[in-house]
C-alpha cells in the first residue's frame, strides 16, 4: 500500500458500487452521495456487489489516484448500515485490504497466561 499522510481521513462508501466506474464516476459519487470533495485529500473506498473487488480514490495533492484490489478468495468485510459513509482508521484500512474483519479484530494468541519468561 502506498503510505498515506497520518492526517488522511478514510471513508467507506456503504452499499454496493458499480465497479465499472473510474475516476470521474467515483468522484461524482463522492460529491453527490457522500457530500464531500474528491479533492479534499481524504481516501474514499468503494466495494462492488460481489464483494471481492474494492476501489480506493484518493487525491495526493497532484491528482486523483485510483487503486483497486480483487480478492482471489473471500470477500472484503463491509458495513451494513443506513448511513452513507463510515470512517476508518489507517489500521482498519490495512486490515480491510488484507481481508481481515476490521470491525472485530481478534488476537491470534490467548491472553492472560502470565508474563513471558526472561531469556538468559
Which residues are covered by each model-predicted region?
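Polybasic/polar functional segments that serve as interface/processing modules
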Residues: 1-120
Amino acid at each position: 500500500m502506498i503510505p498515506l499522510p497520518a492526517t488522511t481521513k478514510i471513508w467507506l462508501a456503504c452499499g454496493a458500487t458499480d465497479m465499472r466506474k473510474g475516476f470521474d464516476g467515483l468522484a461524482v459519487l463522492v460529491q453527490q452521495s457522500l457530500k464531500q470533495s474528491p479533492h479534499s485529500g481524504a481516501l474514499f473506498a468503494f466495494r462492488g456487489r460481489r464483494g471481492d473487488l474494492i476501489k480506493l480514490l484518493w487525491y495526493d495533492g497532484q491528482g486523483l489516484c485510483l487503486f483497486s484490489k480483487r480478492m482471489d478468495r473471500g470477500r472484503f468485510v463491509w458495513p451494513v448500515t443506513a448511513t452513507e459513509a463510515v470512517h476508518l482508521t489507517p489500521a482498519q484500512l490495512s486490515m480491510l485490504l488484507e481481508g481481515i474483519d476490521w470491525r472485530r479484530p481478534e488476537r491470534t494468541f490467548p491472553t492472560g497466561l502470565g508474563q513471558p519468561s526472561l531469556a538468559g
